[in-house]
Structure formats: C-alpha cells, structure tokens
C-alpha cells in the first residue's frame, strides 16, 4: 500500500472516442490531481484526444493500444502497470475496460476497484460473430460488477434506479457528473457562422452521428421549424461525426434543408460553437448526464432536451420534451424562442453548487477513502 497520507488512483478507459465518458473521466482526473495527497494515472486503450488532454494536464498516461494488442496482452500490460505503480484503487469506465481492469487487478494486487456507468450502452453489434462477442463481454462485465468490483457509480439518480435492476443495490452510488465551469467559460470565442449571419436563429445538436443520438429526429424537427415559422432566417448546425453522416446528409436533402443545415464534423472549438447557438437540442433516445448539457448551461445557452436521465434535473420543465417526436421538439423550440427564458443565471448557479468538477472530485475521493478504510488526509 502507499503511504498513509498518499492515495494513488488508476483509471482504465478506452479513449477511442472523445465523448461523454472520456470527457467526464478527463474532468475527474484533472480535478483529483489538484487535491492534496492524491496521485492519479490513466491506462488508456487508444491514442487520441483523451490522451492528449491528460498529458497536457500532467496526468501520467500509459497507452495499451488495442489496435495492436489482444485482450491477453492488455491484461498483462495492466497487471505490470499495477505491480509497478501500486495503485490503492482501480477505477474503470465502459464495458470492456471494466472486464480487463478487473482481471488484471485480481492477478496483480487485488486492491479495491469500482466502475462508473455513464449511461446505457450505445453499441449495436451487427453480424453473428459481433453479437456473440458483445454478449460474452456483457456477461463478463456483469459478473465483474457483481463479484469483483466493490462499487458502481451512476451519474444520475434516474440511471441509479435503473441499475438497481442489474446490480446489487448496496453497490450503487450516485455521483453526478461535474463540469469545470471556469474552464468552459475560458473557451468562449467567436464562431464564424454567427459572425457571418448574426441575425439568423442558430439551432444546433452536438454528438456522435450514431443511431442513439437521433440526429434524424433533429433534422425532422428542423424541417418543422422551417414549415411553422417560415419568416425566420433559420440556420441549423450538426456538430460531430460518425457512421451515419452520409445517411443524414441524404435525409437533409430529402427534407429540403440543404441550404439551412451545416454538417461541421468534429470541432476543436466546440465550446465557442455552442456559445453561439440560440438553442441547443438534445434528442437522444437515452442519456446519463451529458457533459454537453452541463457545458451549455454553464455558457447560458438554452437547451431543449428529451426528458430522460439526468437532463430532467438540469433543464427547465418547459424545455423538456416528453413526446419524443419531431413535432414535440419543434414545438418546444418555438415556445422557448417566443417566450424567452430568464432561468440562465439561476441554472448556472445551480451547476456551480451541485455539478461542479470540484464537488464531483470530492465525492469520488470520499468513496475511494471509504473503500480502503481511510477517513483522514
């Protein structure tokens, strides 16, 4: 074990994307690193945006590249890292990483371990071989949660309730995501599309172009806005990339939105882009507690969202959509634009008090301390 006044935490995460799980892991690691008596490191399965940002923050990163290493070699690499660095707690994110981290931990030092569940699985395997592999990993993941890892963190109360049907109730702990408000505000800047058309109404969606994000529904809702409020100068923005891009571009043409819709792809200035929107739409089929929503609230950007997951706790009731269809979203957007909202300052203050990265890190640290039986630092 480490010295009594020093806590070492190893996080294990894929890093193949820069999405919600990666964003929250980065925010948590960065915040934990600033706490006295805490040392953090990350084992990441892919080089990418996450590893780049972690290194810039000063977090020690070990890459076990899954493109070149099989599961056995990754487990071996994790075991070697654990024996060398000797963490007090192992914290994993996402299904495959939960399994690999659990096995390596058992083979190494068998220290307390836990996972964060960031939301429901978004992976939809195709083909018999892929489906079989997905099912096997899912069963292993469930076994590890029930018999190897001590705690399961849920990022919203609603997600925590759903997880009670899957995991032992005593293992589930709700720790809501945290956002670095100052860091978000520091990234504000001028978005070119707003500078070009300052008089237009800019509505956008941020996320990977995958089925669960329902960008198709966003586009159909935008067609409804164009139909119901034709005198407005509308501009619609899709930020993100993914396998559905060609299909969504074809749908844009079918809906007659080619002049109004811009597919921006992945943007490094996404915070500045969000800050330039009049409305951000979040119409996923399901969510945990999206970092994008927390960032938008921090920026004072109005959000219209599906009434699911942690969104119901941070989006005003009249901007939540229960009718998960195009008309439901277009109606909510028009209502928001016509009536306006004076809730921005109040919502930002609530985020500062309840969803700050510092509060998230402190609550997570308390859980680590509980797992290893330490209460003073």
Specify the residue positions occupied by each region the protein language model found:
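N-terminal strand-loop element at the rim of the active site
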Residues: 7, 11-76, 162, 174, ...
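Short His-centered aromatic/hydrophobic patch
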Residues: 92-98, 117
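Short hydrophobic beta-strand element within catalytic cores of glycosyltransferases
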Residues: 43, 302-305
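A conserved mid-protein helix/loop that constitutes part of the nucleotide-sugar donor-binding site
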Residues: 19-30, 201, 205-226, 243-249
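Conserved acidic donor-binding segment of nucleotide-sugar-dependent glycosyltransferases
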Residues: 317-327, 335-341
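Aromatic "clamp/platform" in nucleotide-sugar-dependent glycosyltransferases that forms part
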Residues: 266, 285
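Carbohydrate-associated surface elements
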Residues: 158, 178
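Membrane-proximal helix-turn-helix segments that form the acceptor-binding/catalytic region
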Residues: 133-152, 166
């Amino acid at each position: 074990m480490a010295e009594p006044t020093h806590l070492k935490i190893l996080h294990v995460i894929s890093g193949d994307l820069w999405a919600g799980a990666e964003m929250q892991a980065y925010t948590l690691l960065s915040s934990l690193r600033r706490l006295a008596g805490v040392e953090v490191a990350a084992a990441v399965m892919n080089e990418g945006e996450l590893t780049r940002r972690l290194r810039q923050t000063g977090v020690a990163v070990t890459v076990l590249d899954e493109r070149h290493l099989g599961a056995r070699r990754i487990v071996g690499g994790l075991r070697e890292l654990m024996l060398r660095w000797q963490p007090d707690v192992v914290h994993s994110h996402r299904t495959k990483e939960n399994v690999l981290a659990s096995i390596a931990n058992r083979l190494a030092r068998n220290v307390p371990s836990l996972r964060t569940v960031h939301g429901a699985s978004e992976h939809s395997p195709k083909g018999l071989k892929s489906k079989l592999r997905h099912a096997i990993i899912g069963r292993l993941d469930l076994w590890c949660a029930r018999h190897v890892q001590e705690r399961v963190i849920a990022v919203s109360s609603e997600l925590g309730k759903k997880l009670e049907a899957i995991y032992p109730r005593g293992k589930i702990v709700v720790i809501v995501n945290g956002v670095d408000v100052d860091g978000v505000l520091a990234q504000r800047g001028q978005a070119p599309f707003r500078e070009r058309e300052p008089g237009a109404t800019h509505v956008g969606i941020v996320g990977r172009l995958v089925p669960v994000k329902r960008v198709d529904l966003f586009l159909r809702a935008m067609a409804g806005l164009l139909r119901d409020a034709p005198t407005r100068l509308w501009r619609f923005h899709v930020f993100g990339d993914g396998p559905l891009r060609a299909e969504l571009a074809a749908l844009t043409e079918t809906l007659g939105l080619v002049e109004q819709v811009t597919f921006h792809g992945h943007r490094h200035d996404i915070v500045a882009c969000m800050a330039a929107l009049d409305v951000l739409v979040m119409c996923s089929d399901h969510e945990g507690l999206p970092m994008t929503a927390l960032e938008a609230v921090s920026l004072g950007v109005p959000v219209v969202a599906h009434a699911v997951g942690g969104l119901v706790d941070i989006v005003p009731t009249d901007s939540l959509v229960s009718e998960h269809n195009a008309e439901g979203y277009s109606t909510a957007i028009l209502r928001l634009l016509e009536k306006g909202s004076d809730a921005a300052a109040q919502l930002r203050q609530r985020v500062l008090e309840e969803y700050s990265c510092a509060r998230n890190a402190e609550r997570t640290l308390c859980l680590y301390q509980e797992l290893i039986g330490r209460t003073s630092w």
